[in-house]
Amino acid sequence: MASLASKDSYLQKLAKKVCTQPSQEPRKRKNEFIKRDGSEEPGQPNKKKKKKPRNKKMKAQSDKRTWNVPQITSNPQKLAKNGQTPSSTGTAASSFSTVDILRKRLQEKIQESRSQLSNKSLTPEDAEKRRQRRKQERERKKRKRKELKKKAAQEPEGNEVKDTKESPETTKEKDPVPIVFNNVEVSDELPNKVMQKKAKKERVKGTITPMTGKNYKQLLSRLEARKCKLEELRAKDEGKAKEFESKIKWTNVLYKAEGVKIKDDEGMLKAALKRKEKKQKQREKRWDKRTELTADRMQQRQDKRRRNIMKKKQAKVDKKKNRARKKGRILPEDLAKANFK
């Protein structure tokens, strides 16, 4: 009996274990329905908010996606006949539709880029116009290059002709003129407008510098040098001396016509120099007097300042002595005065 009872209890336990086996379902996450605060709500899962499309483009894309998605049959019987479950068919259809959409988009982008690069989008008339325009531009550039080459070839020839024309004139104008050292100019640069004017003036008026300015000492020395030169020329050749004198007179006349004062009179220059020296001496005397006066005034002011300072000091001492006398003190000065009296 005991063995039967033990067998019966064993079988009952085994049956319970078999009946109460857990169903093999996919494990759920532990924290599936945990709020942000940390509190759990097992029965109420968080609802995800649907994002609205931001602009029209997004809406259009979403519409395209909905159109291209094939409709899934909702009848489970038909699916069962075909040997497919509803979940498996839905996932397959959705994946198929997304791949198609992506491929279509890629093809559209490739076509757009090709149309931008190539001229297929252009009409044949537009393409022909563009070709003609490019051809004209090339021809214009060729013509321009040829013109530039011709100009470059012609320029040196023109310069040579000018040099040949100007050379006889320069040979005629070149005469033996005495060198004036203060007018020598050396320059490797091309002649600008100022230099051209200067050269023209020299051609017309000559290279002799006019006697102008207020530096009378220098003018006198130049006059003496000119006289010495004339005497030397007269000793050698009177014709050259006369030519030199006529050139000097001609330059003086031209400068006077422009309104420039010519100071070539020796007596007047000496008188002007004396006047200038006299005025300079007078200025020096005035300056000396002024410096002496200013020094005397400064000394007087200093003396006055010292006297005032001494007076103030003496007044302070007298004030202190008077206070002491009022308090009943007898000062040595008072004793001396009493004995003297």
From Swiss-Prot:
Task: Name the Pfam families on file.
Answer: SURF6 (PF04935)
What biological-process GO terms show up in the record?
ribosomal large subunit biogenesis; ribosomal small subunit biogenesis
Q: Which residue ranges traverse the bilayer?
A: none
**Lineage of source species:** Eukaryota, Metazoa, Chordata, Craniata, Vertebrata
* InterPro entries assigned: Rrp14/SURF6_C, SURF6
The Polar residues compositionally biased stretches are 68-77, 113-122
Q: Name one GO cellular component term.
A: nucleolus
Q: What is this protein called?
A: Surfeit locus protein 6 homolog
Q: Which family does it belong to?
A: Belongs to the SURF6 family.
